[in-house]
């Protein structure tokens, strides 16, 4: 949400969304971030709205955008091209590294094998996918939860299918069709573009091949209608969860699918990877710039490991188990009354969206209450370890337009002495700090705090009403120099 805005990507992102989606109409019929869960067939009588992330838009400075991966990659490449301190080596492979107490040496080679290079750096971050070579060479082990399900993934073109779905779900972008024979595993499909392209995945036989899978039959059955399709792509993947024991080994870090992998259920994956980068980047920058330490770097694993574990257990895995239990216990052909009663009870679509709130409340570098994870309750109150909710100031600006690139301390505008104390403490610790003194507008009052320290990733390190809190202690805690503020 706010990440593109705060990292110089906002205008590019919006331009791409506008040009590629609205003007070019590449995803004309997508209604933002809305989904539907159906029973039996998509066009059957049983369905409800599902995972509409717009329900929590008011708690963020920017609304959710469903951006196709190829456009997201375009935005990222466009931004990298603007950064003079970044080089991208296309057509090169990472082959190995060696590290010592002072630095790390990374070896790469041209795909043609003609040339090799060696880079010496302070740190290496492996973002090289679920079968990460960086993770393997670092000796970082991972735990696997094998569901032993072979999944087909296909991309198809079908104007007929699009027309059928648009008659009933023109403002919906992705669909989950439950079927009693699949024991809780999904028939999942979503729009790719306005050219009537769709992706679709579901469980198939373990020995299934491109030739044996009848994609047209499977889609016709899932939708509940007959139509023709043209297959653009077909492939297979194994449904499993994988989680690295640690996201760090010396000077090596891992992020994204290299650190954690899960079935593509619920749209959590790419956002998890972005948040890994967001969490790690400022800590690496702090270390390279001399005001971070090893304890601060260790909190990357402590914070992000807990969030993925919770996302897996409380959301993705739970959805599979809950769906399996529902399908085993209820069937409209067996008992329509009981089925419809249970189906209506399930149709509380806001619950999951409202409860998904990654946080670092248990981190050693925030003054939080509780433990870190992915379960919370969206609210405007400023709470340590949680994301800062937006607020419009009296002059009409949003607080997110004023936050610094590093730490930002937000104070009541009457707290002049505290502002001076904070600047002095930051100077002595060599911490880049922006101090904002704001008046108590209607939305600022919703924070219920007069002292808020916001981290570079827009999570709150400290929030409270205590004017006597030591600014020095708050800052040292936030960078891992001391334990929590009392």
Where are these regions (language model features)?
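Helical substrate-recognition/capping region of FAD-dependent monooxygenase/halogenase enzymes
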Residues: 26-60, 68, 74, 78-85, ...
